[in-house]
Every structure is written in C-alpha cells, then in structure tokens.
Curated annotation (Swiss-Prot):
GO terms for cellular component: nucleus. Residues 26-119, 235-335, 435-529 bind DNA. It is found in: Nucleus. Its main location: nucleus. It comes from the Eukaryota. Keywords: DNA-binding, Nucleus, Repeat, Transcription, Transcription regulation. Disulfide bonds: none annotated. Residues 141-201, 363-405 are annotated as: Disordered. One of its GO terms (molecular function) is DNA binding. Residues 386-395 have a biased composition (Acidic residues). CDD domains: B3_DNA. This is B3 domain-containing protein Os03g0619600.
Length: 536
C-alpha cells in the first residue's frame, strides 16, 4: 500500500509539472503537409478557439535554426489560415508533402516549429549561409526587435557573410495585392510592427502575386549585389496602371510602407543614380483601407524616365530616408531584363529602343483553395473546362513529324501547307499544330490561353511543373508561363495573350510550335503562323 501511495504521489507531481508546463493553455498542435499546404496552412479550429479565436494580423514562426518568419494570418470561411509568408517558410526549410510540423506557442503570436520528415524523424538544419541573420536575432532580442524573414510568391535571396545570396530563402512579399487583370488595387493587411521589417536581412521586397522570371531575377540580384543597399529595397514590376497616362499611380506594399514611408500623406522625393533632377510625387496614405499610393508627380517620373509596362523599378531608401523620405530608383528595362549579357541596368534613363521581348513573364499568382480537399468543378477559374482538350493525339504514324489534338481537324489544304512547313523545319522533335479557337484568342487576358497536347508533352518531355516558356517568332521573343491544371494538363496562360495580340492571331489561324531548347528554368519554342487566308 505504501508503495502504491508513493507511486500516486509521484504521478501527482508529474501531473502538476505538466499543468505548469501548459500554463492552463493548449500550447501545441501538429500539422501534416499535403499537396494543398504549400501555399497556405489551416490552423486547427480547436486550437484557435482555445485562444478565443485571437489570431489575426501576423504571427512569428521560429524555425529550428533560430530564424524568425513573419506570416500573415487571415480568416476565410470561418477558418484561420496562414498565408502570406507561409510559402517562404516552407521553401526555406525544404518542407515536402507528408512532412509533419509541430507548432508550439511560446508567447503571444510566436511559435516554435519543429519539422519531421515522412519517417517521423526530426529534420536537422544548419545556419550556414545565414549566420549574419542568426547573429542579428540574438543581438536584437533584448530590444524586442526580432529579425524576420518575410515571404513572397517569388524567389529571393538572403545575405550571407560574404554578401552573396542563398537560393533557399524567399524575397519578402507583404505588398498590396494586384488583381489578375494586371491593374493595381490595394488589399487589406493587418498592421505589422515596424521592427519586423526594419531589421530584416532580406535584400528586397517584391509585390505580392508578382513573379520574377529567371531572366528578371538574375538582373535584380545582380543589381542588388552591385549597389549593396543598407536597407531593404522595394521591387515593383510596372503594370498598366503604373505607367498609363494621364494619371498613373503606384501601390506600395503596406508593410514596406509602414517602415520606410511616412505614416501620413505627404510629398516624398525620388531620384535616379547619376542624375541631378528630382521628382516629388505625393505619397497618399489612407489608414482605413490600408492603401499606400504614389501619385501626382509620379506621372512626371514616368514620362521623364520613359518608364514602360513590364519595366522593373527598384526603390532604395537613402541613408536619411527616415527624415526626408528620399528614394533612389534604379530602372531595369524590359529588354535589359532579357538581354543575354551585362547587368541590364539603365542608369541614365535613356531609351533603349524597341525591345525584342514582348513580355517580361509577370505572373499574377492566384490564391490557392483554402480547403485541404480541392473542389473539382467542370470549369476552372479561367473559364476552361477541366476536361482535357484531347484524349489522345492524332495524325500520322507512331513517331509523327507533327501532332494535332484529336479534337482538331485539318482540311486537305491545311494539311498540305502544314506538312510543307514541317518538312522545311527539319526538327528533331514532333511539331505541335494548334488551330486557334475562341478560347485561344480571347480579348480578355485572364481567359486567353492555349493547351499543349499530352502526346506532344511526352514527345518533347515537357516538365510537370510551372515553367517559363519563351516563344520566338521573326526574331522577337515573348515570355509566357506554362501552368499545370488537373495534374496533367499544360496550359500557356501568362504572356500568351500578349503573343496573340502582337501577332494578330484570330480564330482559324494555325500555330506550329517547334521545340528548340529545354534549360533548367525555361523552355524555348519557335512559333510559325499560318493565317487562315493562306488556307482558302
């Protein structure tokens, strides 16, 4: 009996210690990664309710190597979702499907995260390449300014000790979102403490739902390495609304503006490297709408520097920016972003002439479905049926010189012209023949797209992931993006509308896609057009 009482006493002591550890709260939860968890993560309702549903604005995730990541928390369909910043955390730690994450709440809105692989073994992370960032966190912890590694849809770089950049991290992306139409519009963001960005080690912030192609990213990174800014720069890809006269405007990231721009509507100063002229646009701030806009004399900056759609403006705060709000603006031209040599930085602001690149591969990244189980419908967001355009390809023998989708049919004259063209190419790969339909030449950019057939994809080994595809025609290039739908369908979406518009394609025209090269980050195809008048 005495032994039994002793055991009970020890058990009570253990229980008491455990209760003290919990501090009366539910401190931990576990999430297993699924295919839908890469862009967003749903917090368990039971855990959120235990805290009275008090998770909004942002939280901080502390990774096993000590880096702090600021992640936006939003409410959607009565669910609490980790969104902006989450993908950067996932990418930085190479988190994969079936990995498990243990979140432990160590203080208000701050979580320690342990990461386990699919075998339930803890992943080990090194601080190599981000030593400066780790050091900054330790030094600044006493002043309550935590270093952050903010996130975006596009890839970025973290400084290491030698000033180079690591591909493991993401560029900050806490900007006002832009709609798929390409127009800027402010999005609602909860307030972030200014210290979160002020001590950030990220070299630049990229607007949310914007994407840098490999060409663009190389040029931006080269510029950042060259100028070595002491503070985080803001990278803006020019949209139609940013450069369209008579009243262009530019939306500034809410979180970036909180740190580097004034907290009220005032005039700011813009300057160009090696130029004496200054511009004084009006910085317009409206707190209730989380809206931060440059307007007014912004039009003069656009006109004087001949800023065009798809150009990239890199805003770097000057040393005294917190007092006089002055920014040096470096301009990367569209043509320069795709040039094969040099840094591509237009320092003098002079015109580079007509560009041979019609699109800088800017992508409007859409929010992924919140529900862990994706709702499959007969039509996707772009109005395209989830049912593939082809069940199998037709035309010709087992290894045909060209491939036509089974739902498309060539007339006798069309077939003759196509075969003559294909013979002249002498391509090692089958040529894809696409007869333009209404969905391929839509005036609306969000609905204009082209599917690449499954058999063609297999013949030229198209990747099963999103990929930049450069289209060539008559010495000019257009950057498009191939996206994956329903797991196997490959659609040219972003940039395809511009190709259609610039080449004046219409229903009934025929495009022949000749596969050229497949590098790691991009595909290149030559496109030969046969206009419908030629087949009459």
């Amino acid at each position: 009996m005495a032994g039994s009482g002793s055991c009970m006493k020890k058990s009570c002591v253990c229980c008491q210690k455990y209760l003290e550890h919990l501090d009366g709260k539910m401190n931990c939860f576990v999430r297993r990664m699924t295919a839908d968890s890469r862009r967003s993560m749903i917090m368990p309702c039971k855990f959120v309710n235990h805290f009275g549903g008090d998770f909004s604005g942002t939280i901080k995730l502390q990774s096993p190597n000590g880096i702090l990541y600021v992640v936006e928390v939003t409410k959607c369909k009565n669910k609490t979702v980790l969104r902006c910043g989450w993908e950067a955390f996932v990418d930085a730690h190479h988190i994969e499907e079936n990995d498990s994450l243990l979140f432990r709440c160590v203080e208000n809105s701050r979580f320690e995260v342990l990461i386990f692989d699919s075998d339930d073994c803890e992943k080990v992370f090194s601080c190599a390449g981000i030593r400066n960032t780790c050091k900054s966190i330790q030094e600044k912890s006493s002043s309550s300014c935590d270093d952050t590694a903010e996130s975006s849809e596009s890839e970025g770089f973290a400084r290491n000790q030698k000033g180079s950049f690591s591909h493991r991290r993401k560029t900050a992306n806490l900007a006002s979102s832009s709609e798929d139409s390409g127009e800027d519009s402010p999005s609602e963001h909860e307030s972030v403490e200014s210290g979160d960005l002020e001590t950030s080690q990220e070299p630049y912030v990229l607007s949310r739902r914007s994407y840098l192609s490999e060409f663009q990213k190389e040029k931006v990174d080269a510029l950042i390495q060259e100028i070595q800014p002491e503070t985080t720069a803001f990278v803006a890809i020019m949209r139609k609304s940013n450069v369209q006269l008579p009243t262009p405007f530019l939306v500034i990231s809410f979180c970036y503006a909180e740190v580097h721009f004034p907290h009220k509507s005032v005039t700011v100063t813009l300057q160009r490297p090696c130029k004496s002229k200054k511009w004084h646009p009006r910085f317009y701030k409206r707190k209730d709408a989380r809206m931060n806009i440059l307007r007014g004399s912004w039009v003069e900056f656009v006109k004087d520097n001949r800023v065009q759609e798809q150009d990239i403006c890199v805003f770097v705060p000057t040393k005294d920016a917190r007092r006089n709000f002055t920014f040096t603006v470096h301009l990367l031209r569209v043509a320069a972003a795709y040039s094969w040599g040099g840094t591509g930085v237009d320092r003098a602001g002079s015109s580079l002439g007509r560009t041979d690149v019609k699109s800088a591969s800017e992508i409007s990244i859409k929010e992924e479905p919140i529900d862990q189980e994706e709702n499959v419908s007969s039509r996707n967001r772009n109005g395209v049926s989830d049912e593939s355009e082809e069940d199998e390809d037709s035309e010709g023998p087992a290894h045909p010189p060209y491939i036509v989708p089974c739902k498309s049919h060539l007339s006798r004259l069309q077939k003759k012209i196509v075969e003559e063209k294909v013979r002249s190419f002498q391509s090692k790969f089958p040529v894809y023949v696409a007869i333009m339909k209404k969905s391929n030449v839509e005036r609306s950019a969000s609905r204009c797209q082209l599917e690449l057939g499954a058999r063609f994809a297999a013949a030229v080994h198209l990747p099963d992931r999103r990929q930049t595809v450069v289209l060539q025609r008559r010495g000019e290039r257009w950057a498009t993006v191939m996206q994956i739908r329903s797991g196997t369908r490959r659609l040219l979406i972003s940039g395809w509308h511009r190709f259609v518009r610039d080449n004046r394609l219409r229903v009934g025209d025929i495009c022949l896609f000749e596969f050229k090269t497949h590098e790691r980050w991009r595909l290149t195809m030559a496109v030969h057009a046969i206009f419908r008048e030629q087949c009459c």
